[in-house]
Amino acid sequence: MIQTESRLEVADNTGAKSVLCIKVLGGSKRRYASVGDVIKVSIKEAAPRGRVKKGEIYSAVVVRTAKGIRRADGSLVKFDGNAAVLLNAKLEPIGTRIFGPVTRELRTEKFMKIVSLAPEVL
């Protein structure tokens, strides 16, 4: 469960290490984002020679949450931390590699590229 001012790790090779959620997209009163939701983020920590710079604003999709996601069979998939993958204006991933597992809930038309790049799908 991600809200405004939440800090997330970055799970791709764009050069960003940590980001801050500045807006949850999808309606004016929308408060929380879960796995598969798109948010606006500001880069807070970045590698010196990365593709992105500190202070830049990007869209991102949430790929892991510590709160977890409930499946239809009753199981709950949780992670140790919150993570996101940075997206361009067309909602395509900027990075060419994904680090760590992602959930099956990302298997929609929009984010199949992220699922195919991920080393493990839970």
Swiss-Prot record:
GO molecular function: large ribosomal subunit rRNA binding; structural constituent of ribosome
Matches recorded under CDD domains: Ribosomal_uL14
One record GO biological process: translation
PROSITE patterns in alphabetical order: RIBOSOMAL_L14
SUPFAM superfamilies (alphabetical): Ribosomal protein L14
Coiled-coil portions: none
GO cellular component: cytosolic large ribosomal subunit
Entry keyword annotation includes Nucleotide-binding: no
PANTHER family per record: 50S/60S RIBOSOMAL PROTEIN L14/L23, LARGE RIBOSOMAL SUBUNIT PROTEIN UL14M
Quaternary structure (record): Part of the 50S ribosomal subunit. Forms a cluster with proteins L3 and L19. In the 70S ribosome, L14 and L19 interact and together make contacts with the 16S rRNA in bridges B5 and B8.
HAMAP family: Ribosomal_uL14
Family in the record: Belongs to the universal ribosomal protein uL14 family.
Protein name, as recorded: Large ribosomal subunit protein uL14
Source organism (scientific name): Variovorax paradoxus (strain S110)
Gene: rplN
